[in-house]
Amino acid sequence: IGKLDSVEVLGFVDNNKSVDWIAECGGHVINLLAKGSYKHCTQQLKMSPEEHLAHIKQTIDYALSKGFTVNLYLEDWSSGMRDSRDYLFMMMDELVKLPIKRFLLPDTLGILNPLQCVEYMRQMVRRYPNSHFDFHAHNDYDLAVSNSLAAVLSGAKGLHVTVNGLGERCGNAPLASVQVILKDMFGAKTNIKEDRLNDISRLVEGYSGIAVAPNTPVVGDNVFTQVAGVHADGDNKDKLYCNDLVPERFGRHREYALGKNSGKANIIQNLNELGLELTPEQTKAVTKRITEL
């Protein structure tokens, strides 16, 4: 209740069908999917750019008549910038005249690297300085996080991320990773409650049935577990092996695993958690036995 204006629903240029069903469901915001590359326009839609543009304008006019806020996806934008920039700029030159709140720029095929992302985003921002651009990364080359950061540092005002990086094919940029990098390395402020990141990750993991890798930054099971004895020893001595990603920040706590690489410091940390205290000789004996196991 009271949050409907925050719910954005994907819709299509489909003779107003999407607008109608979103309205029937009580929605107020449509993220309209248009084509950002000449190839998508002519080969998938079988339309000329002029025909596609006319259909987009008609759909937007209809959505506005229903009281909608309109955002616009330019699907395959990255390919459009690479292969058919004249088409893309022709479309944008007309679209910026319309009351579109945000333009959503996806790297649909996950083909960009950060240098390309900087180049393309800067061109968009310079050519259309009064427009709001979001960037939507895909992770096919494992560059979704890097490209998202490149985009925002080049003028993008919004980033599309997903919990646990879930998404088509290799997924999208993971929320937790993007959040901590923006905050810690660039001083960005968001409304993300970091102490809930682990909870929402587990919730989505449960509903999706897609397990989170144990070494996933921030939310993986093992990322706050120290195994090497030298690390545990350093933590005992002014937290020498800690960075800004302290587990308490995310509602978690650090653990010290026991194994063949464990040292006396690991044993002491675990004993402290259990409220136990051993003599130096006993600690040495326990450490020896643990490493043998």
Give names to the regions the model predicted:
Residues H136-N164:
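Small-aliphatic-rich amphipathic alpha-helix that forms the alpha element of a beta-alpha
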Residues G167-K193, L197:
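C-terminal helical cap(s) of enzyme catalytic domains, especially alpha/beta-barrels
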Residues S37-H40, D142, G165-C170:
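Short gly/pro/ser/thr-enriched loop/turn and capping motifs at secondary-structure boundaries
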Residues G187-L293:
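A mid-to-C-terminal "edge-of-domain" accessory segment
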Residues N15-S131, L149-A156:
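Alpha/beta enzyme core
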Residues V9-D14, H132-V145, E168:
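Glycine-rich beta-to-alpha transition loops that act as phosphate-gripper elements at the mouths
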Residues I1-N16, L258, S262:
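N-terminal capping/small domains of soluble enzymes
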